[in-house]
Amino acid sequence: MSQTQDYECRSHNVDLPESRIPGSNTRLEWVEIIEPRTRERMYANLVTGECVWDPPAGVRIKRTSENQWWELFDPNTSRFYYYNASTQRTVWHRPQGCDIIPLAKLQTLKQNTESPRASAESSPGRGSSVSREGSTSSSLEPEPDTEKAQELPARAGRPAAFGTVKEDSGSSSPPGVFLEKDYEIYRDYSADGQLLHYRTSSLRWNSGAKERMLIKVADREPSFLAAQGNGYAPDGPPGVRSRRPSGSQHSPSLQTFAPEADGTIFFPERRPSPFLKRAELPGSSSPLLAQPRKPSGDSQPSSPRYGYEPPLYEEPPVEYQAPIYDEPPMDVQFEAGGGYQAGSPQRSPGRKPRPFLQPNKQGPPSPCQQLVLTKQKCPERFLSLEYSPAGKEYVRQLVYVEQAGSSPKLRAGPRHKYAPNPGGGSYSLQPSPCLLRDQRLGVKSGDYSTMEGPELRHSQPPTPLPQAQEDAMSWSSQQDTLSSTGYSPGTRKRKSRKPSLCQATSATPTEGPGDLLVEQPLAEEQPPCGTSLAPVKRAEGEAEGARGAAEPFLAQARLAWEAQQAHFHMKQRSSWDSQQDGSGYESDGALPLPMPGPVVRAFSEDEALAQQENRHWRRGTFEKLGFPQILLEKSVSVQTNLASPEPYLHPSQSEDLAACAQFESSRQSRSGVPSSSCVFPTFTLRKPSSETDIENWASKHFNKHTQGLFRRKVSIANMLAWSSESIKKPMIVTSDRHVKKEACELFKLIQMYMGDRRAKADPLHVALEVATKGWSVQGLRDELYIQLCRQTTENFRLESLARGWELMAICLAFFPPTPKFHSYLEGYIYRHMDPVNDTKGVAISTYAKYCYHKLQKAALTGAKKGLKKPNVEEIRHAKNAVFSPSMFGSALQEVMGMQRERYPERQLPWVQTRLSEEVLALNGDQTEGIFRVPGDIDEVNALKLQVDQWKVPTGLEDPHVPASLLKLWYRELEEPLIPHEFYEQCIAHYDSPEAAVAVVHALPRINRMVLCYLIRFLQVFVQPANVAVTKMDVSNLAMVMAPNCLRCQSDDPRVIFENTRKEMSFLRVLIQHLDTSFMEGVL
């Protein structure tokens, strides 16, 4: 599956009118649109109606600007309205003198092809004419077997100005409808007008972090929670199954009701949801019909993409606040060996709520009926749960359940846990006290291996299973769906239990994103286990009513689980290395951590299809998905590299060569393609996989920032966007008081350099202070780089944006980030290397390429050496080096190109000949330990600065300084002096003078000339008279110079050790036998 196929929304075969830029005759086919809150870019073709996430190649794209307005259409008033994504203004009248992007054409396209079934499914509380608050539209992609209208991708989290709730079509404010979903979309609205959910049919939600749904935790649940995992239409014959063409593009966990052969369509019977049902007020049979909607003025902007913003709705009272779960809230287990699942809610055609557990009037109550959730005696415990910093920040604002304080059903009851029962199908209800665990600790007893909300499953001791059956039958073990061990950030590495055969097969009538594929063979779905479907149905009928009592807990746990599942699932999809059929995804497919409050990710069919595409992934996959610490901190063995996407497995400087080799060998065996990711034995960079690398890292390491009188929490998205305000505490959590103080001052200095704050000192001195702070205090480095990433994100002041990238380039010239943040900074820089990101007057791609190069180099060399702090000259040189490349670290051809204007007649690099002459001029051939004793590092740095300006100071006294700089120049060449393609020949002929000389003459001309000049230079030092003084014979010289001419590409320490000896021998043979007389007088 190609990336374009996966990310674009295909349109119906309807021609759209041609669009042109106002005031221009240029035909406008592709335009860039930026969602106002999440700042996600998408590209729409106004001719074909195609929408893609990645910029199309080879076409002109109209960049977004403050002068861009979106033309939308309100079907209720039959009027066009206009929305400015930059200023977030919505007006009725057509703006003048600006670019109008006619997005309403896509609306018209949808309306012309909309299925009549959408109206058939409408019911009270689902008014199709009611606009959505927060504009919660998401991108939809039609299934391959259907012909649906194309929709413009949009995100959740629109500002209130972009969408407000309307009661009647005569509203005086512009509508909130951006683009409605096409082809059978069912919307639920709560009594106060909030969108509850969408139910979609024969459609896929588009992948990645670019689609969201706002789901009010109130009354009903989306169809992806109500889908029947066994593939049978409820109340229908068991032989009737919903059909879809098989293939990797179909979701293995979401049931789609596609048209049958006779044209009929099955819809699931809809029952009240135990997860998304709001506690009802006394005497109110339906919260949908009980209360009027809130006026539009009460609407608030929805939460941004990665946010920890406060919820859109008021937080419930403390005494009724449901706990934040990191495990399922209860497990109702029953006897009789049935495979009962409490988590398969459905909807009846009339959508009338049914009680979850109605008393059995004709028989004794079932064990499920005895479930009573009593009021928690220690409600304050729920608020004092100990979490790791990552887990607390992640879970704290994850889900809020709207509760009515007077509801008799609203009980804060004890939590229940699974109780393994070795007696086969016997179940029992075991309440347990509040489990106050630190998320950083592994779960011992009561560990929930499958985060399935209230679903009831066997908890028998695990039995051996074929891995394929494990993957197919377990919620958490299904290859890419979710490992509940990562349900909360602090507990991702806890060990999950493997389900037994009976346990897995009894879970077939489940619902939600972890369900089994409906197309799977029955033999795979239901291997012999001793249970039958009949007990399941009976138990289902007996236990329907515990849902009402446990609603608040179940809703919170279920929504948290859904969000976490989507997060882990999309993190797997973000792997840019192609899997099996080459359907890997590139850098815009990952999903960030869950949103706060009632904002919940929609688990889409498109997201679920990756489960089927990557069957070979195992249960342990998501236990290691959190950070690149897998290798950077050596927290686990490199043998687990298959359990994590490639970009999270960067070999670090502290990693041994054997681990790197093992990692690379397994990677090659997986992809079948050799990789150069471990060319250097210490560290190398790999293409980043996720747009949300920094956001994911930030969600676990950022401080909580608040704003305003009511101390509203600042979302991660806003914390990573440009700000003209100062910060009151560091962005990254730290316990170092000095770092806390310096971080706030550092942010002000960055603003001063970028021109966002008035400064008394000149910019160079401000940059010097910034670089000095980062160079001196290692704890400030990540803070500095995350602040620079923030100030260069969504910065529309071009001069400020250029200065921000310039300051990042300056800092990278002196010190790298810490290994923990290294890969995330790499991902941020990499995404800006495409020239499409360049704006008028700001060559962002040039800055990004330079920064990427410096970051790669800094990973190998570390921070600036020496005791002297950076000075103004070094700052000026680092600033100019962005557009005036240095002679150090460049290729030989580039060095020759730099000197072409100054020294057009030279055949050799000026820096090589000038430094060599300086060594001899300072009697280096009569200095003991020449080329072995290093020069003073501060003097070497100063000389390097001068040489890069085509100057050599006359006051040098120590020959070790130019000798050390000369070795540095050879060593830092972009490609080694003897290219890689000749390396094996050199190693093979290390003891043959004739063959070694032949290799030299086979080199490219510039390489041959430079190498011969070096050999002739070294031959001066091997003269017996000089060796007697320098103590550097031919073997010693070969030893110190060979690493500067040859580079071993192997990661095996044994190969490196053996080749080092051969490299020295090869260079010694050249010094002794290569005739360099033809280099006499050549410069």
Curated annotation (Swiss-Prot):
Site (Arginine finger) residue list: R932
Metal-binding in keyword set: no
Disulfide pattern: none
InterPro entries per the UniProt record, alphabetical: MyTH4_dom, MyTH4_dom_sf, Rho_GTPase_activation_prot, RhoGAP_dom, WW_dom, WW_dom_sf
Keywords: Acetylation, GTPase activation, Nucleus, Phosphoprotein, Repeat
Location of the region described as Disordered in the Swiss-Prot/TrEMBL record: 110-154, 226-369, 405-545, 570-599
Cellular-component GO terms for this entry: cytoplasm; cytoskeleton; cytosol; glutamatergic synapse; nucleus
Predominant localisation class: nucleus
TM annotation in the entry: none
Compositional bias segments (type: Basic and acidic residues): 268-280
Location(s) in or outside the cell: Nucleus
Domain MyTH4: 722-879
Sites bearing N-acetylserine, chain numbering: S2
Name of the protein described by the UniProt record: Rho GTPase-activating protein 39
Biased composition (Polar residues): 245-256, 474-488, 573-582
Highest taxon, organism lineage: Eukaryota
PANTHER family noted in UniProt: FI04035P, RHO GTPASE-ACTIVATING PROTEIN 39
Limits of the WW domain: 25-58, 63-97
